[in-house]
Curated annotation (Swiss-Prot):
GO terms for molecular function: ketol-acid reductoisomerase activity; magnesium ion binding. Substrate binds at residue 414. Mg(2+) 2 binds at residues 217, 389, 393. InterPro entries: 6-PGluconate_DH-like_C_sf, 6PGD_dom2, KARI, KARI_C, KARI_N, NAD(P)-bd_dom_sf. Pathway: Amino-acid biosynthesis; L-isoleucine biosynthesis; L-isoleucine from 2-oxobutanoate: step 2/4; Amino-acid biosynthesis; L-valine biosynthesis; L-valine from pyruvate: step 2/4. PROSITE patterns: KARI_C, KARI_N. Involved in the biosynthesis of branched-chain amino acids (BCAA). Catalyzes an alkyl-migration followed by a ketol-acid reduction of (S)-2-acetolactate (S2AL) to yield (R)-2,3-dihydroxy-isovalerate. In the isomerase reaction, S2AL is rearranged via a Mg-dependent methyl migration to produce 3-hydroxy-3-methyl-2-ketobutyrate (HMKB). In the reductase reaction, this 2-ketoacid undergoes a metal-dependent reduction by NADPH to yield (R)-2,3-dihydroxy-isovalerate. This is Ketol-acid reductoisomerase (NADP(+)). The keyword NADP applies. Keywords: Amino-acid biosynthesis, Branched-chain amino acid biosynthesis, Magnesium, Metal-binding, NADP, Oxidoreductase, Repeat. Residues 209-344, 345-485 form the KARI C-terminal knotted domain. It is an enzyme of class 1 (oxidoreductase). NADP(+) binds at residues 45-48, 68, 76, 78, 108-110, 158. The gene is ilvC.
Length: 491
């Protein structure tokens, strides 16, 4: 199979990368009606599989789970999750032939095997759904021409998809139809109904493409969402301890600091995050973020280039074929880092202290978010997609570190994201350690920034630069839309 994106000509590639339309709420007036009375079979019952299924059932759809015969016989975790929640469970042979929509929510590396197993069982004119397009775009999976292929990609972990639905809301979602597989012309209707059934239409839906979703998703998770947090955690902890700080305090400052700092992003973007700092600290964080950008721009661009060309996916798939040798080695190395093994700190750190003692961390977040966004946009990805794949998802990933440090982050994210994270962090960590950490000043990390004389013009210009970055402008628009949607949904 050939990488699908690489089979397209340049015009087609640019068209697919640039697919991004914010859908109007009235386009979802019929909500999930298009799929009511149809049989929907979900393959896989992990976080996305279970939680999307729960939402879809609560929206009035007929949901069952197709699992491997051995998973049922051995009562594996997927079988237990599905049965404990009252779902019908059966083998592929039992459930797939009658399915109108088969939703493949297994891990990326299992997709080719799953498709090979289910496609011969699917009835003429059925639909196949994904929540991530790697199998179609990077693997180049060829789907039978009578089958409609759609994607609904919630921009959150599965648990969040469920929690927001229970609150009467939803999570921002990308939907797409594979242009090679829309024989009846109703792919968009299927995707819209599926997105509405998960609650996504209440938070905002982008009509995108498989290509745009895959390329932007890979870029976000490799760089700012996971790679930057991993590299930043390791170098910040090592620096604090080297400076004589209590290892337990250092561990807590980093572990919970990312979540506290990025929570401000959710409410008011980079502007609000920077406004949590004193003027002296804000100017210093801005300066540090520019220094970090200067050192890491090439790495962000390399990751984007390798994602666009298919080099990244080819390298990762070679590791799949080698029994995940590199992935498992890097996972083990991460588990041995000093930060992962830091002692527990029993003392309290106030919310403001995380900002005041984490100026470098704020700078890393700012630099990483802006670099990821700018690099995606420069590669033809629309601003809305780039926003969701950088700033929007960051607080959700930071929350996983708050739970159980880097281990938890790497368990929760997909193996695809984890592999890309290590590729980035393995290069970024030594660069930050050698090029940035030795230049730090008193107050950059672990203690407050000393108050300095503030020049009005300088402060004005820095504030303008922060507020007028393109990610702040599109972010304000998209967060405003989500707030409006939440207000409408609560009435």
């Amino acid at each position: 199979m050939a990488n699908y994106f690489n089979t397209l000509n340049l015009r087609q590639q640019l068209d697919q990368l640039g697919r991004c339309r914010f859908m109007d709420r009235n386009e979802f007036a019929n909500e999930a009606d298009y799929l009511k009375g149809k049989k929907i079979v979900i393959v896989g019952c992990g976080a996305q599989g279970l939680n999307q299924g729960l939402n879809m059932r609560d929206s009035g759809l007929d949901i069952s789970y197709a699992l491997r015969a051995e998973a049922i016989a051995e009562k594996r975790a997927s079988f237990q999750r599905a049965t404990e929640n009252g779902f019908k469970v059966g083998t592929y042979d039992e459930l797939i032939p009658s399915a109108d929509l088969v939703v493949n929510l297994t891990p990326d590396k299992q997709h080719s095997k799953v498709v090979a197993d289910v496609m011969p069982l699917m009835k003429q004119g059925a639909a196949l759904g994904y929540s991530h397009g790697l199998n179609i775009v990077e693997v180049g999976e060829q789907i039978r021409k009578d089958i409609t292929v759609v994607m609904v990609a919630p921009k959150c972990p599965g648990t969040e998809v469920r929690e927001e639905y229970k609150r009467g809301f939803g999570v921002p979602t990308l939907i797409a139809v594979h242009p090679e597989n829309d024989p009846n012309g109703d792919g968009l209707e299927i995707a819209k109904a599926w997105a509405a059934a998960t609650g996504g239409h209440r938070a905002g839906v982008l009509e995108s493409s498989f290509v745009a979703e895959v390329k932007s998703d890979l870029m976000g998770e490799q760089t700012i969402l996971c790679g930057m947090l991993q590299a930043g955690s390791i170098v910040c902890y090592d620096k604090l301890v080297a400076d004589g700080k209590d290892p337990a305090y250092a561990g807590k400052l980093i572990q919970y600091g990312w979540e506290t700092i990025t929570e401000a992003l959710k409410q008011g973007g980079i502007t609000l995050m920077m406004d949590r700092l004193s003027n002296s600290a804000k100017l210093r964080a801005f300066e540090l973020s520019e220094q970090i950008k200067a050192k890491l721009t090439f790495l962000f661009e390399k990751h984007m280039d390798d994602i666009i060309s298919g080099e990244f996916s080819a390298t990762m798939m070679a590791d799949w074929a080698n029994g995940d040798a590199n992935l498992l080695k890097w996972r083990e190395e991460t588990g041995k880092t000093a930060f992962e093994n830091a002692p527990k700190y029993e003392g309290k750190i106030s919310e403001q202290e995380y900002f005041d003692h984490g100026v470098l961390m704020v700078a890393m977040v700012k630099a990483g978010v802006e670099l990821a966004f700018d690099t995606m946009v420069a590669s033809g990805i629309y601003e809305e997609s780039a926003y969701y794949e950088s700033l929007h998802e960051l607080p959700l990933i930071a929350n996983t570190i708050a739970r159980k440090r880097l281990y938890e982050m790497n368990v929760v994210i997909s193996d695809t994201a984890e592999y890309g994270n290590y590729l980035f962090a393995n290069v970024a960590t030594p660069i930050l350690a050698k090029e940035i950490m030795p230049t730090l000043q008193k107050g950059d990390l672990g203690e407050p920034t000393p108050t300095v004389e503030i020049d009005n013009i300088t402060l004005r210009d820095v504030n303008d630069a922060i507020r007028n970055h393109p990610i702040e402008l599109i972010g304000q628009e998209l967060r405003g839309y989500m707030t409006d949607m939440k207000r409408i949904s609560s009435h």
